[in-house]
């Protein structure tokens, strides 16, 4: 753990320029300087993500991580943990901003995810000293750091009363871009997003839209990397990396049981990772 005062060189300059800047931060990271020098995007949203929210979050995170963008979120249930996991699965880096001390991971079920983030050369960050438990106020205060350390904030799914709207307000106060994924008008979990767009937030429908806002272009920073969120995805994508395969051959090479294979194939097709090209042959997109 590193204890960094706001006058230290390792203190993020982005956080010195926000209203109510923290006087100190505590971090756990093996790669802090590199993270400071990288473009950062906050990705937040509903704690009860729908299948739509899951798909768009993973797709957009993979797209920007491939350009070297670091994903910032709050380690919470739903969109937050999806964003962290998608970044890790894409071979990228991610920062989790906590509402508690570094020794009080919340929720406790995300202790393993927190360790994975650090192991993958990301970071845990908080303004709270060790042994501080996550009081209710801490969550809102934490949100200003999520937006503050990032160049822009992306909300992929949020209801009309979502806590993500606090972060959007902080971002606007800090002069940051608020990017929003539009959702179905029949979906309550996208009502907050659609309302933000009506009020002037930037609608986002692709990773390229985000990269344009961040002024990032060029080739992928993550080369020869299989972007997989879990071992089943990896087995299928790795099997296809040397060429197209029939459904039966792909099933055999992946060594997955039938139910997991079919579920993973369907998900990879829906999310635009693979496609069928006649005769039930699969290819990577």
Predicted regions and their residues:
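Glycine-biased, small-residue-rich flexible motifs in mid-sequence functional cores and linkers
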Residues: 1-285
């Amino acid at each position: 753990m590193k204890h960094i005062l706001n006058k230290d060189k390792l203190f993020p300059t982005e956080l010195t320029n926000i209203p109510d800047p923290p006087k100190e931060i505590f971090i756990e990271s093996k790669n802090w300087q590199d993270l400071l020098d990288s473009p950062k995007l906050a990705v937040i949203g509903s704690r009860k993500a729908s299948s739509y929210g899951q798909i768009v979050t993973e797709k957009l995170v993979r797209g920007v991580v491939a350009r070297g963008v670091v994903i910032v979120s709050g380690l919470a249930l739903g969109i937050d943990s999806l964003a962290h996991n998608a970044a890790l699965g894409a071979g990228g880096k991610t920062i989790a901003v906590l509402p508690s001390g570094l020794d009080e991971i919340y929720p406790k079920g995300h202790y393993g995810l927190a360790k994975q983030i650090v192991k993958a050369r990301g970071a845990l960050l908080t303004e709270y000293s060790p042994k501080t438990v996550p009081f209710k106020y801490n969550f809102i205060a934490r949100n200003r750091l999520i937006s503050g350390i990032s160049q822009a904030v992306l909300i992929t799914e949020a209801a009309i009363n979502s806590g993500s709207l606090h972060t959007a307000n902080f971002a606007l106060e800090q002069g940051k871009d608020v990017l929003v994924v539009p959702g179905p008008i029949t979906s309550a979990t996208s009502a907050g997003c659609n309302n933000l767009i009506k009020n002037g937030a930037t609608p986002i429908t692709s990773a390229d839209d985000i990269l344009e806002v961040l002024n990032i272009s060029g080739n992928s920073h993550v080369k020869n990397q299989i972007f997989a969120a879990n071992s089943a995805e990896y087995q299928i994508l790795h099997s296809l990396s040397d060429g197209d395969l029939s459904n039966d051959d792909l099933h055999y090479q992946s060594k997955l049981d039938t139910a997991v294979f079919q579920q993973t194939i369907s998900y990879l097709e829906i999310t635009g990772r693979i496609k069928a090209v006649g005769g039930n042959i699969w290819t990577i997109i």
